[in-house]
């Protein structure tokens, strides 16, 4: 049983890695062309997303600004925001690294924020982080509060990820202890090769530990935020925080496509609410759809409840929660893979565009 489960996890991890790689079939490209044409035909008025301060999009685990300098992490999102009047920058941090510490993603993001401010003449930025990018954004808001106007987190594991716990437990079964270092070495190379800048600052084991529920609790103690609810409550916190006299607007949303179903002999089933059963094209065109359904099922059986395949609803709650009802998996949240998503999934590009307008109306 344990061996079978581990095999499934390995298969799911391989599928996830493959899904992130820069490739697309002809059918997927045709679908994307149609989608972009429809978006252009219904585009809001110019200036709709013109926020007062620049927006910085912050990628999560395994990310970069453009994979191998070609495939955007935030697929089609930066362009859409720019077309609607926003000033948008995309951070390029270590794909595999912790958020704190001198080599951490937080310090990397802080340096990038200062670069953007120097280039634009702005005094603050709006940080929008996906997955681990939300934790990196919180770091900057904590250590340099005067540089931040708002923090928005999308599918961020503020309480850690049950799947990260699971992977850590599986690696602990190895009596030699070699598997962790060997796998980490391969993952680090993957991070270097896929980074647009071939960033060598990669530490897969540190990244894994950062995303566990235990380490997340420590991170929250070291970098507290009013946007967090009480530990274990599955509640969000305040919609704003004031740090050193600087007020930050705090927002979050998340996908919860993976929902628990019936339990049989102690094993809980799951369903992907984003797709048509069996026949949805996303199951074929986007390998991450089935992979994240598998990882989400593992999470449910570790008590996570509804999730996006990597982050639970409860873990994603932060600040003013705009929605936890999107029928998205973890990659749908950033319009991946290549804009392909399940038949019932909402348009993430439109959601982020609307949020930029929300920030504009809030005066930031």
UniProtKB/Swiss-Prot annotation:
<comment type="function">
    <text>Catalyzes the hydrolysis of triacylglycerol. It shows a preference for triacylglycerols with a chain length between 6 and 12 carbons.</text>
</comment>
<comment type="subunit">
    <text>Monomer.</text>
</comment>
<protein>
    <recommendedName>
        <fullName>Triacylglycerol lipase</fullName>
        <ecNumber>3.1.1.3</ecNumber>
    </recommendedName>
</protein>
<feature type="disulfide bond">
    <location>
        <begin position="234"/>
        <end position="314"/>
    </location>
</feature>
<keyword id="KW-0479">Metal-binding</keyword>
<dbReference type="GO" id="GO:0046872">
    <property type="term" value="F:metal ion binding"/>
</dbReference>
<feature type="binding site">
    <location>
        <position position="332"/>
    </location>
    <ligand>
        <name>Ca(2+)</name>
    </ligand>
</feature>
<feature type="active site" description="Nucleophile">
    <location>
        <position position="131"/>
    </location>
</feature>
<dbReference type="GO" id="GO:0005576">
    <property type="term" value="C:extracellular region"/>
</dbReference>
<feature type="binding site">
    <location>
        <position position="336"/>
    </location>
    <ligand>
        <name>Ca(2+)</name>
    </ligand>
</feature>
<feature type="active site" description="Charge relay system">
    <location>
        <position position="330"/>
    </location>
</feature>
<feature type="signal peptide">
    <location>
        <begin position="1"/>
        <end position="44"/>
    </location>
</feature>
<keyword id="KW-0732">Signal</keyword>
<keyword id="KW-0106">Calcium</keyword>
<dbReference type="Pfam" id="PF00561">
    <property type="entry name" value="Abhydrolase_1"/>
</dbReference>
<feature type="domain" description="AB hydrolase-1">
    <location>
        <begin position="54"/>
        <end position="266"/>
    </location>
</feature>
<dbReference type="GO" id="GO:0004806">
    <property type="term" value="F:triacylglycerol lipase activity"/>
</dbReference>
<feature type="binding site">
    <location>
        <position position="61"/>
    </location>
    <ligand>
        <name>substrate</name>
    </ligand>
</feature>
<keyword id="KW-1015">Disulfide bond</keyword>
<keyword id="KW-0964">Secreted</keyword>
<keyword id="KW-0443">Lipid metabolism</keyword>
<comment type="similarity">
    <text>Belongs to the AB hydrolase superfamily. Pseudomonas lipase family.</text>
</comment>
<dbReference type="GO" id="GO:0016042">
    <property type="term" value="P:lipid catabolic process"/>
</dbReference>
<feature type="binding site">
    <location>
        <position position="132"/>
    </location>
    <ligand>
        <name>substrate</name>
    </ligand>
</feature>
<feature type="binding site">
    <location>
        <position position="340"/>
    </location>
    <ligand>
        <name>Ca(2+)</name>
    </ligand>
</feature>
<keyword id="KW-0378">Hydrolase</keyword>
<keyword id="KW-0442">Lipid degradation</keyword>
<dbReference type="InterPro" id="IPR029058">
    <property type="entry name" value="AB_hydrolase_fold"/>
</dbReference>
<dbReference type="InterPro" id="IPR000073">
    <property type="entry name" value="AB_hydrolase_1"/>
</dbReference>
<feature type="binding site">
    <location>
        <position position="286"/>
    </location>
    <ligand>
        <name>Ca(2+)</name>
    </ligand>
</feature>
<feature type="active site" description="Charge relay system">
    <location>
        <position position="308"/>
    </location>
</feature>
């Amino acid at each position: 049983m344990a061996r079978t489960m581990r095999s499934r996890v390995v298969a799911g991890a391989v599928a996830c890695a493959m899904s992130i790689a820069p490739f697309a079939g002809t059918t997927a490209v045709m679908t994307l062309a149609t989608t972009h044409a429809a978006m252009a035909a219904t585009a809001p008025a110019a200036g709709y997303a013109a926020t007062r301060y620049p927006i910085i999009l912050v990628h999560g685990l395994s990310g970069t600004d453009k994979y191998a300098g070609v495939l955007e992490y935030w697929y089609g999102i930066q362009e859409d925001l720019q077309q609607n009047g926003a000033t948008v920058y995309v951070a390029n941090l270590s794909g595999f690294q912790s958020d704190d510490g001198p080599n951490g993603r937080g310090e990397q993001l802080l340096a990038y924020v200062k670069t953007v401010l120097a280039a634009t003449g702005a005094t603050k930025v709006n940080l929008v982080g996906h997955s681990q990018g939300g934790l990196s954004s919180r770091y900057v808001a904590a250590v340099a509060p005067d540089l931040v106007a708002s923090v928005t987190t999308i599918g961020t594991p503020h309480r850690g990820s049950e799947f990260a716990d699971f992977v850590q437990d599986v690696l602990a079964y190895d009596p030699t202890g070699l598997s962790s270092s060997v796998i980490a070495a391969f993952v680090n190379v993957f991070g270097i090769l896929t980074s647009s800048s071939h960033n060598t600052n990669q530490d897969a084991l540190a990244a894994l530990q950062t995303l566990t529920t235990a380490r997340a609790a420590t991170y929250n103690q070291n970098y507290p935020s009013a946007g967090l609810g009480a530990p274990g409550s599955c509640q969000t916190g305040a919609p704003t925080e004031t740090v050193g006299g600087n007020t930050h607007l705090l927002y979050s949303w998340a996908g919860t496509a993976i929902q628990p179903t019936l339990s049989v002999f102690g094993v809980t089933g799951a369903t992907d609410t984003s797709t048509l059963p069996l026949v949805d094209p996303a199951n074929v065109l986007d390998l991450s759809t089935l992979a994240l359904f598998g990882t989400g099922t593992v999470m449910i059986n570790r008590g996570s409840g509804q999730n996006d395949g990597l982050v639970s609803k409860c873990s994603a709650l932060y600040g003013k929660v705009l929605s936890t009802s999107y029928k998205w998996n973890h990659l749908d949240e950033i319009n991946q893979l290549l804009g392909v998503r399940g038949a019932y999934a909402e348009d993430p590009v439109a959601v982020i565009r609307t949020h930029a307008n929300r920030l504009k109306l809030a005066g930031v």
